[in-house]
Each structure stands twice: as C-alpha cells, then as structure tokens.
C-alpha cells in the first residue's frame, strides 16, 4: 500500500487503522520557527471527532493529539513533525459477523481482492477514522497559511439529501453561524430541516448523502504548476481522496454544462474580476480570487437495513452492519475538507516561493 503520502514540499504521511492501537502521521516541510503546540491542533480535531452530537456516530473518542517530534520550546524546528492519536472506544466484537462477509458498498471486497487480507474491524485502514490525522496535519497548514499569508480556509455544509441551503446565503457566508451549530451550516432554516431529516433516518436505520463547500480567501496569484500539477487538479486529487467523496467541483463545476461562454467567463476591469465562475483558478493557476471547491459525499453503506452480498467463498449472504456509524458522513467531513485544501495550498505556496519569488 503505497498511497499514504500527499504533497511534495509540504508532505503528509498517515498511518493507522480504525481499531488499531493508534493513528499517526508524519508531516515534512513545515518551515522552522512556527509557534506550535497541541492546543493549535486540537480545536479542528474536536470539530471532526465522533460522539459530539446526536447527529453523528455514538462512538466516543477524545482524539487528543500528541506531538512527538519536530517542535522544540514551542516552535517548529524544520524537521519532521510526528503526531499520534490513541484509539480508545473500539468495539471490535461488533464486526465479528462480517469477518467472512463483504459489506455492500464498502471497501471490504476490493481490499480483500487486492491484498488477500483485510482488517475487518471497522473497515481498518479504509475507515474514515484515518482522516483524524489529515485534520491534525491540516491544522498546522491552516495556522501557517493564516499567520504568514493571511489565507483563511473554511467550509460549510450546503446540502443533506434533498434539503439545500438558500442560494442567497452562499454569496455572503456568516462564519459565526457556521460554527454555532453541529451541521456547520450558515442557514438557520436549513439546520432545522437537517435535524428533522437525520432524526427520521436514524429511526429507519438508513443514511443519506451530502454536499459541502470549502473556500480559501486571500490566496495570492500564481499557485499551481501546469500542466500535470495544476492547482485545481491537485485540489481535486486531495478532496477526492476523502472517504465517501464521489464528486468534486471547482467553481461552478458541473453547472458549466448549461452556461454559455458569455456567461461563464470571468470578465476583468481595472478594479478586478466581475465574477468568479472559475472558482479562483485559471489555467491551473490561482487568480487571486477566492478558491471555491464543492464535494459530494455518498450515503454510508453502514446501515442496519439488511442487504445482499457474498462471503469469502462467493456464496450469497445477508449483511446487517451492527457497528456505530454516522447517518450522514458529510457532517463531520467539513474540517476534513478544510484540512485537505490547506495541505494542498501550503504545498503549492512553498513550491511557488522556491521557483518564482
């Protein structure tokens, strides 16, 4: 399994499984003399961690991060930063029945076919629990971007199932509202509808998909390395690598199919751009406008409704997932998406400074 690292100058490698002893990551490329402690990282982990509201999995993990290396007397040294989070609330017995069965819609089948072995407890390496370390690494990236470049990376939930936030709100996000509710949603009326929908799904034992948007503001012009390391290509790669993500849009995304060139092009004046249909990226290079990315997440297949599948011998079986799971994985994905965008932006900023200025 070689796909555990992302980035070139700012590099993040994660390790660990859902029901293992701990999760961990190594972060290379953090410039020296950045003031850093666990307290700078923990707030983002607390936004992602399970068991914090009735809308997410009841699994309870403190997700307390510990910095092992790369920080001395409260500042980064320029060497590798190692971090771990110990797992505490595993209930591996919940997964005994699927040891020899493949959960439909999960990575069980493909991991078994590829490697000939799999950790069936909570999905092992394929579990979204792994993303805790991405959030930890992303918190470092967000801090550096904010303090050294004035770049803010923030996200919000825009849709769960058929319930969408008001289009008018998207143009002027109230970030205080986003942080004031467990859905990370800027639309108070949508929050009430989200609540009703999730309650209904939990009663039925089912799940639902979601859509969320991440915005990076104050990004300078020039980030991105055409042609294969375009900024939008690397963002799509990073965001698509989040568990359950099935679609990524930059700017207007798939809506461009119905637009005409006269509408979609972002006209320019001496005062700047007149619109931002491109999502802040032109020709794979940041334009100086806000970078906007939207991701779609599938409904989790971990539900209590029986589903057809096969076992290791290829025989038909019925599968019911008994573990603790999110009725909508999109809710806790907001800080994960923020982290992945921040990791990509810092990597490209360091590459830009090394080559251009």
Swiss-Prot record:
InterPro entries documented for this protein: Chorismate_synth, Chorismate_synth_AroC_sf, Chorismate_synthase_CS
GO cellular component: cytosol
Key word Amino-acid biosynthesis present: yes
Pathway assigned in UniProt: Metabolic intermediate biosynthesis; chorismate biosynthesis; chorismate from D-erythrose 4-phosphate and phosphoenolpyruvate: step 7/7
EC number(s) stated in the UniProt entry for this protein: 4.2.3.5
Keywords annotated in UniProt: Amino-acid biosynthesis, Aromatic amino acid biosynthesis, FAD, Flavoprotein, FMN, Lyase, NADP
Binding site for NADP(+): 48, 54
Residues that hold FMN according to the record: 125-127, 243-244, 283, 298-302, 324
PROSITE patterns the UniProt entry points to: CHORISMATE_SYNTHASE_1, CHORISMATE_SYNTHASE_2, CHORISMATE_SYNTHASE_3
Broad EC category: lyase
One GO process term, biological-process aspect: chorismate biosynthetic process
Required cofactor(s): FMNH2
The keyword Flavoprotein belongs to this UniProt entry's keyword annotation: yes
Note on how the cofactor is bound: Reduced FMN (FMNH(2)).
Pfam families named among the record's database cross-references: Chorismate_synt
Reaction equations catalysed: 5-O-(1-carboxyvinyl)-3-phosphoshikimate = chorismate + phosphate
Superkingdom of this protein's organism: Bacteria
Molecular function (Gene Ontology), one example: chorismate synthase activity
NCBIfam families associated with the record: aroC, PRK05382.1
Function statement: This reaction introduces a second double bond into the aromatic ring system.
PANTHER family: CHORISMATE SYNTHASE
Family: Belongs to the chorismate synthase family.
Assembly behavior: Homotetramer.
Protein name: Chorismate synthase
Record organism: Haemophilus influenzae (strain 86-028NP)
């Amino acid at each position: 399994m070689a796909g555990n690292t992302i980035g070139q100058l700012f590099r993040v490698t994660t390790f660990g499984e859902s029901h293992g002893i701990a999760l961990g990551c190594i972060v290379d490329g953090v410039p020296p003399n950045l003031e850093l402690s666990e307290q700078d990282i923990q707030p983002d982990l607390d936004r992602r961690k399970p068991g914090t509201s009735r809308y997410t999995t009841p699994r309870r993990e403190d997700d307390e991060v510990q910095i092992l290396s790369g920080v001395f007397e409260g500042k980064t040294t320029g060497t590798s930063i190692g971090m771990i989070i110990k797992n505490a609330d595993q209930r591996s017995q919940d997964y005994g029945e699927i040891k020899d069965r493949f959960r439909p819609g999960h990575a069980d089948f493909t991991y078994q076919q590829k490697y000939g072995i799999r950790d069936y407890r909570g999905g092992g390496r394929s579990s979204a629990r792994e993303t805790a370390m991405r959030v930890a690494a992303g918190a470092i990236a967000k801090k550096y971007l904010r303090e050294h470049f004035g770049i803010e990376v923030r996200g919000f939930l825009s849709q769960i199932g058929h319930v969408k936030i008001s289009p008018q709100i998207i143009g002027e996000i109230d970030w205080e509202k986003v942080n004031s509710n467990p859905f990370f949603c800027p639309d108070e009326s949508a929050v009430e509808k989200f609540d009703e929908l999730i309650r209904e799904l939990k009663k039925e034992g089912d799940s639902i998909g979601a859509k969320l948007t991440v915005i990076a503001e104050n990004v300078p012009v020039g980030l991105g390395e055409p042609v294969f390391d375009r900024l939008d290509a690397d963002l799509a790669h990073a965001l698509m690598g989040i568990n359950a993500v099935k679609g990524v849009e930059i700017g207007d995304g798939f809506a461009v199919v119905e637009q005409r060139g006269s509408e979609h092009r972002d006209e320019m004046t001496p005062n700047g751009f007149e619109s931002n249909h491109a999502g802040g990226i032109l020709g794979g290079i940041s334009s100086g406008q806000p970078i906007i990315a939207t991701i779609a997440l599938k409904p989790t297949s971990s539900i209590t409704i029986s589903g057809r599948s096969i076992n290791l011998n290829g025989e038909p079986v019925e599968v019911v997932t008994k573990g603790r799971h999110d009725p909508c994985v999109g809710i806790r994905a907001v800080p994960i998406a923020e982290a992945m965008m921040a990791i990509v932006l810092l990597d490209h900023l360091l590459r830009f400074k090394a080559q251009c200025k």
